[in-house]
Amino acid sequence: MKYLFFALCLYLYQGISEAEVPAEQIPLEAQALSGLPLVEYLQKNQRLFEVTATPVPYFKQRLMDLKYIDQNNIPDEEVEDEELEENNDDIPESYDPRIQWANCSSLFHIPDQANCGSCWAVSSAAAMSDRICIASKGAKQVLISAQDVVSCCTWCGDGCEGGWPISAFRFHADEGVVTGGDYNTKGSCRPYEIHPCGHHGNETYYGECVGMADTPRCKRRCLLGYPKSYPSDRYYKKAYQLKNSVKAIQKDIMKNGPVVATYTVYEDFAHYRSGIYKHKAGRKTGLHAVKVIGWGEEKGTPYWIVANSWHDDWGENGFFRMHRGSNDCGFEERMAAGSVQ
């Protein structure tokens, strides 16, 4: 049975507001740092986040090519949601949907995109899963298939090389997307097909990963034994665009659920372990798309609560916190989401 998913697609350009601060000027010598010298610089020159040395080649396998920063790949129609433009007095200092919607298991789920730049599809599918649950008040619990999007939406981008979250939401609207899940799992139509890289605690070891994975081919059929057909398992929505501000992002998250951010990644992010990330040093390495679920403040520093897609043993149990209000790394410029009506 199709669950009609009416979506509000956001492509958000963030201008300067009263909550924002100017971007920090990074010294040229700091911009050129890499490897251990970069880790040592971060340990000595900033206190917002903890770092640990991470191999950069493996890190790059999980990023998109910089060409996907293209801001022109957006819907033609712009629709302004007047309800989100009302006064902002009711925006709390902190908001975490995992508290309000603790029964929505997808909010706690951290996927593993492996050695594929599929973050644009993985994060979009994850946000869609959350919003279906929130709209149904916890009654509808599904994981939307990132594999269906990354393999079958040929106009969304180039699979494992990268793509646009805004196009992933349009694909949901035009064709519908089936259910999915993690690698080698059952109970859904199209689970993820690329195995996790390396060791992850007591979980099954599938092997190491060398280079970027090839994009799995599109299969318009469900796993053998799954009780639904591919067409009957699809979830649909209606897509359009919304005018943006940081407060509009917050209000939309409170009203509808998580959104997706696309931002420029520098090498210092490769070494993030915990805390509030704010770009401090290192070279530009690619693009990444992530699911933004809420926000908060720690010792006067505002942040976004973000779910990554690099397994739950990365960062803060798969999550990280991103500096809020400074548009660091362009984080607040390009956001997409869908709201259920």
UniProtKB/Swiss-Prot annotation:
UniProt-annotated catalytic positions: C119, H288, N308
EC numbers on record: 3.4.22.-
Annotated SUPFAM superfamilies: Cysteine proteinases
One Pfam family cited in the UniProt record for this chain: Peptidase_C1
Positions annotated as glycosylated: N103, N202
UniProt key word Protease: yes
Keyword Amino-acid biosynthesis: no
Stretches of the chain forming a coiled coil according to its record: none
Disulphide connectivity of cysteines: C104-C133, C116-C160, C152-C218, C153-C156, C189-C222, C197-C209
Described function: Expression of the protease correlates with blood-feeding and suggests a role for the protease in blood digestion.
Record's protein name: Cathepsin B-like cysteine proteinase 1
Organism of this sequence: Ostertagia ostertagi
Lineage: Eukaryota, Metazoa, Ecdysozoa, Nematoda, Chromadorea
